[in-house]
Regions:
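Secretory targeting and sorting signals
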Residues: 1-28
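Propeptide-to-catalytic entry region of secreted or membrane-anchored zinc metalloproteases
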Residues: 28-145, 179, 368-370
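Short pre-active-site segment immediately N-terminal to the catalytic Zn-binding motif
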Residues: 63-64, 168-189
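Catalytic zinc-binding patch centered on the HExxH motif and its immediate surroundings
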Residues: 101-104, 142-178
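Catalytic Zn2+-binding segment of zinc metalloproteases
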Residues: 192-208
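Structural beta-strand segments of beta-rich domains
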Residues: 313-317, 415-419, 491-495
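Long, low-complexity serine/threonine/glycine- and acidic-rich segments characteristic of extracellular
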Residues: 327-384, 410-412, 422-578
Length: 578
């Protein structure tokens, strides 16, 4: 069975710098409000996502907030963003517009509107443009994005949402998407694949409805396209050889599928339909590995700690690390080349070093299963080194035990989360973290993997010195109701999913057919309130086919993912299409 979903923002993504040059320069209006939505740490040490809105009047601002909530929660439902959202700060910039909507929407002859970012469809209201190419004034966007203080431009992704239900967007460091379209929230993770991960499109066409032709070039630089056979990849240890034969996270099996990079023949990709080909599916493992590397490269796994240099043997060496949502980073210490067991702090006094000079090294890397290439894993690992001179005496230190950066406490965490804390760094003592789950003591260092919890609300506390932090744990999974209906002829099926949760925030619904990849339920491409339609031939919308389902018996699984990241238990419905 094959479900065809829209794969592109436009037939081809045009670099934003090329399509904004013809737009008039604008002076940014000063009335804008920066709202931090997720702050996981110092913006200078995080990857920062800045979300702007255009064409939203003061009266429209509640809709903008809802649009942003949906976009973010869809993003957090997709790996690796789900596991590494703790590496990302998110800021919403509310820019009241004098008028509602954006220019040339939906037609190229429709009204041109004076909005703060000058967003417009049709490649900037060009009669020879592409309707879905949603552009904006990059200078204005930069001015508003700069209202978020302390965020380095080099470590920032700007996403601008247009007040529109028309499908569209564009890629680049200044990405765009329509805020209210049924599928618009799926544009963001696809575009981040380009701008953050350097991934290529896997479309087998350049213009919708026009076959892409045959690729006749050499072996592409793209890590997820090749001319090699599976046997050649294995024998030569090239491209995605480590993943061959695995069940793809995007459905099917990692292998070799013809078409990609706008060509329909002569070039091959790893999966039948990853998010870089069809919006709605996940990244496959090949692209997910690259995105994990790219997100990790935007930050430093060692955030802080004892400065490198010469120290005495009477002190404590410390490192602060990042804390992924679902696992702990690996911290490995060596003294004179020999491994020693320690956590984030190494108390040199306990080593009883012989008089003289010694070398201490620490390495922090990520043991995630998302990475299989050792070179990729090593590319964002970090190390620190110290010279230990036993003749050096550490001066008195007035630093008190206390908290540093922690997992944010302002929103619930999911039941299977890892909660992370960092502490201050007294020179001659290692602060102890005392953990409790619902009042019961548990043993952990700087990362607490939550134990199995019954459905409901729970509380975790951590105490360091006289300071305490408390987290709320949402252990109640979301639910989803399904309505599957067929006419008497049984030749089609409509599926409507309605997710819900006991906590605030947009709840994502997904389904998969006959064990294929999980697919985001967005309603119907033209209307988020309509159910998804399956037929034997599918429905063609703007030269893309949706809901093609062969005649026969099928099992449809469905589930929900809540704002905290909990998965609901998958349920099934069995249908027969005649």
């Amino acid at each position: 069975m094959l479900i065809r979903a829209a794969a592109v923002v436009t037939a081809a993504i045009t670099p934003l710098s090329l399509v904004t040059a013809t737009l008039p320069a604008r002076a940014a209006e000063p009335a804008a409000t920066v709202v931090p939505l997720q702050v996981t740490g110092d913006p200078a040490k995080r990857f920062n996502l800045v979300v702007l809105g255009d064409g939203y009047t003061e009266a429209d601002m509640p809709a903008f907030r809802q649009n942003v909530d949906k976009h973010l929660n869809v993003l957090w439902s997709i790996e690796p963003y789900k596991s590494y959202r703790s590496y990302i700060n998110v800021y919403r910039v509310e820019i009241p517009s004098k008028v509602s909507g954006v220019s040339c929407d939906p037609g190229v002859t429709d009204a041109r509107k004076d909005t703060p970012l000058g967003m417009s469809f049709w490649s900037g209201c060009r009669t020879d443009g592409i309707q879905r190419l949603l552009v904006m004034n990059e200078d204005a966007a930069n001015t508003y994005a700069n209202l978020v203080k302390g965020v380095p431009a080099a470590n920032r992704q700007v996403l601008a949402l247009a007040n529109s239900t028309t499908y569209g967007g564009a890629g680049g460091s200044y990405a765009t998407a329509s805020g209210g379209n049924a599928m618009s929230a799926l544009i963001s993770p696809h575009e981040l694949g380009h701008s953050v991960g350097g991934l290529d499109d896997e479309y087998d066409y350049y213009y919708r409805g026009v076959p892409g032709g045959t690729y006749d070039g050499g072996e592409p630089d793209s890590l997820h396209h090749t001319l090699l056979t599976e046997d050649q990849m294995r024998r030569r240890h090239l491209k995605w050889w480590r993943w061959l034969g695995e069940r793809s996270e995007a459905g099917g099996t990692i292998g070799r599928y013809e078409g990609g990079m706008y060509y329909s023949k002569g070039i091959w990709r790893p999966s039948a339909h990853s998010i870089m080909k069809q919006l709605g599916y996940y990244y496959d493992q090949v692209s997910r590995e690259r995105m994990t590397q790219a997100i990790s490269a935007k930050v430093d796994l060692i955030q802080d700690g004892t400065p490198e240099g010469t120290v005495g043997a009477d002190r404590v060496l410390s490192v602060e690390t990042l804390h992924p949502v679902d696992h702990a980073l690996r911290v490995a210490w060596t003294v004179d080349g020999r491994p020693v067991r320690a956590g984030h702090d190494l108390d040199l006094r306990r080593l009883r070093l012989r008089p003289g000079v010694h070398k201490v090294d620490v390495r922090v890397d990520d043991p995630t299963a998302f990475i299989r290439d050792p070179a990729v894993r090593a590319s964002f690992a970090r190390t620190r080194s110290w010279t230990v001179d036993t003749s050096v005496r550490t001066p008195p230190d007035a630093t008190s035990p206390g908290f540093g950066t922690t997992t944010p406490t302002d929103r619930p965490v999911a039941a299977r989360s890892v909660i992370g804390v960092e502490t201050t760094h007294p020179a001659t003592s290692a602060p102890h973290v005392e953990w409790r789950v619902d009042g019961r003591p548990v043993n952990a260092d700087r990362d607490l993997r939550l134990p199995p919890l019954r459905p409901g609300t729970h509380h975790v506390t951590a105490r360091v010195g006289d300071q305490t932090r408390t987290w709320t744990v949402d252990a109640t999974p979301p639910t989803v109701t399904a309505q599957a209906q067929q006419p008497p002829a049984g030749d089609q099926l409509t599926l409507k999913l309605t997710p819900s949760d006991d906590q605030a925030g947009y709840v994502v619904a997904e389904f998969r057919v006959d064990g294929d990849g999980w697919y985001n339920y967005y309603g119907w491409p033209t209307d988020s309130t309509r159910p998804f339609l399956f037929t034997k031939t599918g429905t063609t919308i703007d030269n893309l086919v949706y809901g093609r389902l062969a005649a026969g018996r099928h099992t449809i699984e469905y589930r929900a993912i809540d704002a905290a990241g909990n998965y609901g238990k998958p349920r099934t419905v069995t249908v027969t299409l005649r």
